[in-house]
Swiss-Prot record:
It comes from Brucella abortus (strain 2308). PANTHER family: PROTEIN TRANSLOCASE SUBUNIT SECD, PROTEIN-EXPORT MEMBRANE PROTEIN SEC. This is Protein translocase subunit SecDF. In the N-terminal section; belongs to the SecD/SecF family. SecD subfamily. InterPro entries: SecD, SecD/SecF_arch_bac, SecD/SecF_bac, SecD/SecF_CS, SecD_1st, SecD_SecF_C, SecD_SecF_C_bact, SecDF_P1_head. Its main location: membrane. The chain crosses the membrane at residues 9-29, 277-297, 301-321, 324-344, 372-394, 404-426, 460-480, 579-599, 605-625, 631-651, 682-702, 706-726. It is a multi-pass membrane protein. Part of the Sec protein translocase complex. Interacts with the SecYEG preprotein conducting channel. SecDF uses the proton motive force (PMF) to complete protein translocation after the ATP-dependent function of SecA. Keywords: Cell inner membrane, Cell membrane, Membrane, Protein transport, Translocation, Transmembrane, Transmembrane helix, Transport. The keyword Nucleotide-binding does not apply. The gene is secDF.
């Protein structure tokens, strides 16, 4: 019913108003928000690292249990907060990994230095029974060992293995400038127990009676001529004030319980992030504008209502992201564009049903009511299949792909709400106020209103072509394979920007050769000032990838700024590869189960096979054109899985409906009629979704551009497969009407489309 009681209408408008209030801070500057009353919301959706700039690390905690992982994360968070890096993201991932994101910090090496130092502090007594040189050349005493200093070259000290003091005896550590010589020092504050032990150690009267050791390296070996009965002790060493402050914070926060290894490093400069942000916002706005204009031209006042609902959809989506504290990234923008496509698809389904029922002789009000009612199950099924792919991607994906999956999942919820309640409310108010005598005519036609195309006559041709194409792709995969990006093969990718003039690609190549870095490629970037350096996996462990990153900084930092740094070790690349394959498999399994539950096994199997066809063909595009296959490629494939199922479910839903009504009709005729009845929706939705991705391709970054291109091709392939693969497979699988189905009389239009009457 189009009727809404007052309280239902009030609740819907209240939900929209509350969402607008929650989302409103995102449309104002921070300075404007500061001047608003305190009772108004001021929380904004934060920008992700790819839009704001910053650094991201994936760290592996060795031999970590749950307690060690939590303790390590807390210590890392404390270190970053004390150093002034506000609101860092420090979260556990999996069984033994920690993800760290710090907006505004562009020196990833500094971040690694802060977080990978264990901070094991000890005071160790000197062993004067033999000289360090003799111990190095020979064998040190059983209870002693040689420990080297931070100096260059390092100096060896013969120290007792058992510490006199440890970090547990330290209550505070602060960096300052010495009043004596103006050099940076670290002042340690000891507790009472530590003070007594230090006094006992130095009471022996031996000069150089102890050394201060951090992570098994001597940082200071003070000369002591008498007992030290003090709670404060200064460490002097070869470090500047920043290094001293970093060390003080490390000592103050406590030692990490286990050693930490860097598995993945990603850094993006603020200027590049701002460029990405501007381009992403422009792409999203243009996508919404193009889609909205198309809907208005196609459906008149109903298109205007769809456009208003789309704006409300985006507002509610923004409000939810604000409430849960999510950040907006390039991936989120891509998810937003996909949400726009899903929302428009739902409206097209309803409006095409309305027009179909109006042609059958229904009144405008009856057609509106019937359109919403009959499109409901199709909309829900189509969106839930996409939701399955999004949830799998969220659970198995990593990094920015999480943002895409989260945005799509939330967007599906907001799309269902706005389409099935808010749009319906607006149409009800329009019908009640304007009392229209006719459904608005379509001003823009891509396909005829009614078609009678005999698709099933081509079933063997199309199935044969598709089988042959899939076989060719499989052969190419076996013999050539994907052009894997660093996400799946490991390695480094660095975007350099010349500090003066243009980037000299030849010079960069020569300098890389001098560094003895294997498998390095230098490519031109979007600007003549920039160059892209891609280095393959070193295949000797995660530390080797980090060594390459250090070499690059040391060689090029004076002449080039590092706009972007991505370093992925073999451990992470293997995990991402497994997760990518598993994500596709689980998506197909989940969708098969859902479609089987909602329909029948023939339809479930047909849907999965046609979707698998789309995955294979889309993969073939990556292989043939040697497009880089990375996490974005997996996201594109999973999105197309959802979109393909969306298309297929719409046709299958109509097949199911016609089978129930006309169980005596030949199955090929029913399938032909079902495809023709939904053809305008299929082509309109494909065209609108394709339009939505054009701005994303035009203005997105390189990865987003590849993603948009893959989706655009995937949309075409998915539309083809839903008509020429999924539908004919139902005949091959012997689909029949259920015995309990009751047939209705065949009206003239359906009889003509079913070819049951001449």
């Amino acid at each position: 019913m189009l009727y809404f009681s007052r309280w239902k209408s009030a609740l819907i408008w209240l939900a929209v108003l509350v969402s607008l209030i929650i989302a409103s801070p995102n449309f104002f500057s921070r300075e404007t928000l500061e001047n608003l009353p305190d009772f108004l919301p001021k929380k904004q959706v934060s920008l992700g690292l790819d839009l704001s700039g910053g650094s991201r690390l994936i760290l592996q905690v060795q031999n970590a249990g749950k307690t060690d992982l939590e303790t390590t994360a807390n210590i890392m968070r404390q270190r970053l907060e004390e150093l002034g890096y506000g609101n860092p993201v420090v979260e556990g991932e999996g069984r033994n990994q920690i993800r760290v994101e710090v907006p505004g910090l562009y020196d990833a090496q500094l971040l690694k230095d802060i977080l990978t130092i264990r901070g094991n502090l000890s005071f160790r007594a000197m062993d004067d029974t033999m000289s360090p040189d003799d111990a190095i050349r020979g064998t040190p005493p059983a209870d002693s060992e040689i420990v080297y200093s931070f100096d260059d070259p390092p100096v060896g000290y013969l120290l007792k293995k058992t510490p006199i003091l440890t970090g547990h005896d330290i209550t505070d550590a602060k960096a300052s400038i010495s009043a004596d010589d103006g050099q940076p020092v670290i002042t340690l504050t000891l507790d009472d127990n530590g003070r007594r032990r230090l006094a006992d150690l130095t009471a022996q009267g031996n000069e150089n009676s102890f050394a201060i050791v951090v992570d098994n390296q001597v940082v200071s070996a003070p000369t002591v001529s008498g007992p030290l009965d003090t709670s404060e002790l200064q460490i002097e060493g070869a470090f500047d004030l920043q290094a001293a402050n970093n060390m003080a914070v490390v000592l103050r926060s406590g030692a990490l319980p286990q050693a930490v290894t860097v598995l993945e490093e990603r850094t993006i400069a603020s200027a590049l992030g701002e460029d990405y942000a501007s381009a992403a916002v422009l792409a999203a706005l243009l996508a919404a504008l193009v889609v909205g204009l198309f809907m208005v031209l196609s459906y008149g006042i109903l298109g205007v209502i769809a456009l208003v609902a789309l704006v409300v959809n985006i507002v509610i989506l923004t409000a939810v992201l604000s409430l849960i504290g999510a950040s907006i990234s390039l991936a989120s923008i891509a998810g937003l564009v996909l949400t726009i496509g899903l929302a428009v698809d739902a409206h097209i389904l309803i409006y095409e049903r309305v027009r179909e029922d109006r042609r059958k002789g229904y009144s405008v009000v009856q057609a509106m009511e019937s359109g919403f009612y009959r499109a409901l199950s199709t909309i829900v099924d189509a969106n839930l299949t996409t939701l399955i792919a999004a949830l799998v991607l969220f659970l198995l994906g990593s990094g920015t792909v999480h943002g895409f999956a989260l945005t799509v999942a939330i967007g599906i919820g907001t799309t269902l709400f706005t389409t099935l309640t808010f749009t319906r409310l607006l149409i009800a108010q329009w019908v009640r106020t304007a009392k229209p005598k006719e459904v608005p005519k379509r001003r823009l036609k891509l396909v005829p209103t009614v078609t009678h195309i005999p698709f099933m006559r081509l079933q063997f041709v199309t199935l044969g072509i598709s089988v042959l194409a899939c076989a060719i792709v499989v052969a190419l995969f076996v013999n050539i394979g994907f052009n894997y990006g660093i996400d799946f093969r490991g390695g480094s990718m660095v975007e350099l920007q010349a500090r003066n003039g243009d980037a000299n690609l030849e010079d960069i190549n020569e300098r890389l050769a001098e560094l003895n870095i294997d498998s390095a490629r230098v490519l031109p970037a979007k600007s003549p000032r920039s160059a892209l350096v891609i280095i393959g996996s070193q295949e000797v462990g995660d530390d080797a990838e980090q060594t390459v990153a250090v070499k690059l900084r040391g060689e090029f930092e004076q002449d080039y700024s590092f706009q972007r740094v991505d370093v992925v070790g073999p451990t992470v690349s293997e995990q991402l590869s497994r997760a990518g394959v598993l994500a596709v498999i689980l998506s197909l399994i989940g969708i098969f189960i859902y479609v089987w539950f909602r329909f029948r096994w023939q339809l479930a199997l047909g849907a999965v096979l046609s979707t698998l066809h789309d995955v294979v063909i889309l993969s073939g595009m990556f292989i043939v054109f040697r497009m880089e296959f990375n996490l974005w490629s997996v996201a594109a494939i999973l999105t197309i899985i959802g979109y393909s199922l969306n298309d297929t479910v719409v046709i299958y839903d109509r097949v199911r409906e016609n089978l129930r009504r006309y169980k005596s009709a030949p199955l090929p005729a029913i399938i032909d009629a079902s495809i023709n009845q939904t053809l305008s929706r299929t082509l309109l939705t494909s065209f609108v979704t394709f339009l939505a991705h054009v701005p994303l391709y035009a203005f997105g970054g390189s990865e987003i551009r590849m993603f948009a291109l893959a989706l655009s091709v995937g949309i075409i392939v998915a539309s083809y497969s839903s008509i020429f693969i999924a539908a004919p497979l139902l005949v091959q699988f012997g689909l029949k009407p259920r015995e309990t189905d009751a047939g209705d009389a065949v009206d003239a239009e359906l009889a003509q489309s079913l070819n049951l009457e001449s």
